[in-house]
Amino acid sequence: NYFNACITTDKFSIGEYKLIGQKNIIKSEWASLESSIEYEKVKYLYDVSFVGGESSYRRWFVNELGARGIKVHCFGDRWDNGRVSYEEMEKIFSVTRINLNISNSIQYDIRYLMASPRNILNTLRGKKNKSQVKARVFEIPAQGGFELAEYVPCIEDYFDLGKEIVCYKDVDEAALLINHYLSNSLERESIKRAGVLKARQQHTYIHRIKDFMKDIAIFHEAESNV
């Protein structure tokens, strides 16, 4: 045991730390930079957008939404709009009615797998074999956006689903939710407002640092009393 403490964002790996003799384990999480960008009375530029690198699954997902009449404006590596800076990303989140958060982990939707032999190969070769909460979950609301995220385990530990952010389980549900929230702006804006407040009050990196420094102090005090 060479460390006073270890920090992980994956609560399911805590047991692995214990197996190698690590006693002081801090469960933390990704977060967002602080933001004061305006999110009330916004002039929207996009109905639906996505910011993140292109992947075969994400491309398939966006195309599936397009086949249902839903245009997604995509930004990032290998998308037509290309990369954007952090400042540009902030603005995109705030001027989009519905911000998609599409996972980049291995996907097993049979429709995606059967769409191309390459998709099957990518799945078999993929190293991202489980979905996790990532920084984007917190960045979208912190920067003033309404978030429609793919459900991943433990996301409900940080937001009240359906009241602060909204989650979908597959492309069919995503399409239904997009159409619903585009047609119900008052409900969407209420959820967005609650999500922004939660993210800015509890889920910035300043909050994370303060929390794990408190834990480290507790571990240090306990060891000093031994």
Model regions: which residues?
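Conserved acidic donor-binding segment of nucleotide-sugar-dependent glycosyltransferases
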Residues: 165-171, 180-185
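Surface-exposed charged/polar residues within alpha-helices that form helix-capping/stabilizing sites
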Residues: 91, 179-180, 197
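A charged, aromatic-enriched C-terminal amphipathic alpha-helix characteristic of glycosyltransferases
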Residues: 183-214
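Glycosyltransferase donor-binding loop in the core domain
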Residues: 132, 166, 200
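Nucleotide-sugar donor-binding catalytic core of glycosyltransferases
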Residues: 1-161, 206, 219-223
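Short, hydrophobic alpha-helical segments
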Residues: 182, 213-224
